[in-house]
């Protein structure tokens, strides 16, 4: 069971060539936050070795572009007229809003990786995955699809267990600031999605992951010694 969950979570949340059972994953959504520790640790390796400029490339390589694509679609919907927001977030073409979101996103990553420590990179990635968990367990699907399928067995237990990696904050008390920021952004994205789309979609969940990751890194950037 544990090995199946490990394979399923890594296969779903990373580009690693492992096969798993998505049914196992959707019954154990709490694992998202723990996968964040793994992804963050891998991303932080170049920074520890002094090659911080490789962090962005490694991040894209290990996490893929699904969440980034979600951020772009969310950006298009955010800037779209009220009556076209649902159409915009489903549109496969990149619009101006999405391009703006992507440019700002990668600029934040590029500059943040120069200064933040490995701990904050890992913690920011944990917060990003916890954000995804929070949306999947506390909201409703905007329409039928993979997101609704993943949310079918979401329980409060997932949030409780998924919160355990957040205890990393005790190692660096200042980490409470990116933690509070991440929760705030997650709740704002959730509220926005429910008002504009009637719930969350895969793009919304992916966008929340990116927004929280970049935002938390930016907060950590200003906290850096």
Curated annotation (Swiss-Prot):
What is the originating organism of this protein? Archaeoglobus fulgidus (strain ATCC 49558 / DSM 4304 / JCM 9628 / NBRC 100126 / VC-16)
Keywords assigned: Cell membrane, Cobalamin biosynthesis, Magnesium, Membrane, Transferase, Transmembrane, Transmembrane helix
**EC numbers on record:** 2.7.8.26
What parts of the sequence cross the membrane? 34-54, 93-113, 116-136, 165-185, 204-224
Reaction(s) this enzyme catalyzes, per UniProt: alpha-ribazole + adenosylcob(III)inamide-GDP = adenosylcob(III)alamin + GMP + H(+); alpha-ribazole 5'-phosphate + adenosylcob(III)inamide-GDP = adenosylcob(III)alamin 5'-phosphate + GMP + H(+)
Family note: Belongs to the CobS family.
Q: What is its main location?
A: membrane
Q: Which PANTHER family match?
A: ADENOSYLCOBINAMIDE-GDP RIBAZOLETRANSFERASE
Q: Which GO terms describe its cellular component?
A: plasma membrane
Keyword Iron annotated? no
Pfam families xref list:
CobS (PF02654)
Q: Which GO terms describe its molecular function?
A: adenosylcobinamide-GDP ribazoletransferase activity; cobalamin 5'-phosphate synthase activity
Membrane disposition: Multi-pass membrane protein
**Which gene specifies this protein's sequence?**
cobS1
Described function:
Joins adenosylcobinamide-GDP and alpha-ribazole to generate adenosylcobalamin (Ado-cobalamin). Also synthesizes adenosylcobalamin 5'-phosphate from adenosylcobinamide-GDP and alpha-ribazole 5'-phosphate.
Look up the record and give one Gene Ontology term from the biological process aspect.
cobalamin biosynthetic process
**What InterPro entries has UniProt attached to this entry?**
CobS (IPR003805)
Q: What is this protein called?
A: Adenosylcobinamide-GDP ribazoletransferase
Pathway membership, UniProt: Cofactor biosynthesis; adenosylcobalamin biosynthesis; adenosylcobalamin from cob(II)yrinate a,c-diamide: step 7/7
Q: Where in the cell is it found?
A: Cell membrane
């Amino acid at each position: 069971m544990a090995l199946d969950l490990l394979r399923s979570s890594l296969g779903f949340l990373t580009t690693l060539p492992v096969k798993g059972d998505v049914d196992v994953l959707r019954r154990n959504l709490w694992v998202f936050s723990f996968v964040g520790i793994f992804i963050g640790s891998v991303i932080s390796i170049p920074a520890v070795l002094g090659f911080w400029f490789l962090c962005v490339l490694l991040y894209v390589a290990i996490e893929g572009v699904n969440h980034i694509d979600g951020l772009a679609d969310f950006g298009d919907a955010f800037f779209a007229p009220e009556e076209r927001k649902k159409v915009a977030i489903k549109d496969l073409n990149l619009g101006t809003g999405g391009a703006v979101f992507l440019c700002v996103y990668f600029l934040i990553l590029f500059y943040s990786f120069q200064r933040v420590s490995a701990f904050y990179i890992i913690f920011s990635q944990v917060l990003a995955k916890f954000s995804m968990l929070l949306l999947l367990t506390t909201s409703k699907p905007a329409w039928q699809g993979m997101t609704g399928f993943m949310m079918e067995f979401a329980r409060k237990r997932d949030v409780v267990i998924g919160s355990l990696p957040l205890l990393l904050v005790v190692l660096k008390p200042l980490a409470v600031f990116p933690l509070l920021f991440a929760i705030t952004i997650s709740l704002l994205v959730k509220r926005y999605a429910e008002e504009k789309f009637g719930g969350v979609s895969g793009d919304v969940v992916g966008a929340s992951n990116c927004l929280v990751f970049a935002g938390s890194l930016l907060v950590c950037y200003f906290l850096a010694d």
